[in-house]
């Protein structure tokens, strides 16, 4: 039977896609349906029909799945942030476990590993320490703040995101009132005019410090507007609506005049307070600027990094490489338990932050390099290999060079695209006993584990960690051991 656009069909959802879409079949024809979950019997309208599969819009739930819940957020269906808020949290964890395990087996052809249930959150709401709200103009001419609808740049009004900090809504209300009172226009993507593009709010969950950063379409703002903004925001930090334990410690401007989807520009100005806030992961203190990369769920990050530290098996004598180290979040965790840690990150500002974070924590056994890991590590390996063989160098220099290129442990925490194969080749050449792979995409994790398996490294344990409830994203930590050659 063939199907075409606008056909209405009734069927049961049997699976969930990687984007959170419900998947079902009608007479063998596969349909993907946003907002539907496993077990739902639905009526849907086909919006795009291809030869072997199509996409449909959920029209009516005839019989709800036992895992279906009412989303806490009233705009969950329109907003592009939470794809699976309509699933119970336990069902979300099961979905993520299955996603990781299936990818390892299907893509990586990985077998014989110990797979653990996902580490979930005690409270799967209010977990994000960072929110970036686009600012625009509604059809009636009023100022709108919120989030983009899925796959669009249409702003859905939402100032109380249920996975963000509760304080954000009150801060946004003050900024909106300030804009209205002073005639400050929102940025218009079509014309390139208007001043305020985004509002960035960062919260220190362990320190209760808040940063507010206005991203503006310009390189300056009048002193009168600055003083007015600071006056209003410093008052809101004492507002009864906000927990008295939390207050604004930093008010910043960020300048972005580019016609781009990138939210932040390169330059910032401190209007009031500090140019950063502080927070902790475990007992490591971090300074966080508007431009800093910092994990958005610090409570789950402690569990994630704790598992990485456990898998690293450090005793205090090891040499460790941390590739894609960011601002040193994992590096500094490891450094307290290792002889020496080397970190590599492509973003220069992140390396400056890493060095600063090492200094404020009194950590002197971590060294950081700027550049692409797939370029820095092979180059460093060749350079240190020459030094290790250089008879004109001191024995201490040669020994340190040997240790640096024969690490006991390598930790990788790559972006979603995973590791470059040339980097994996160099890691294998370094011959560490252990590789700890922290992944934000189980498909590329599976691919890379398959490549490592072909080079003599066996995946032993895999632990999913839910960092982002109500979304389809899941982190994983894998322990990979060097296989010992068989003894005849």
Task: Label each residue range with its predicted role.
Residues 22-27, 146-149, 213-215, 354:
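Short, acidic/hydrophobic/Gly-rich beta-strand patch recurrent on exposed beta strands
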Residues 59-66, 70-71, 77-186, 206:
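Extended interfacial segments that mediate partner engagement and assembly in macromolecular machines
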Residues 201, 208-217, 285-289, 409:
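Short, aliphatic-rich beta-strand segments
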Residues 116-124, 189-190, 197-198, 202, ...:
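Short, solvent-exposed loop/turn elements at beta->coil junctions and helix N-caps
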Residues 155-197, 218-252:
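Internal alpha/beta scaffold segment
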Residues 1-71, 75, 367, 375:
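Terminal RNA-binding accessory module
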Residues 45-49, 134-138, 202-206, 481:
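Short beta-strand micro-motifs enriched in acidic
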Residues 2-7, 18, 220-227, 231-488:
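Rossmann-like S-adenosyl-L-methionine
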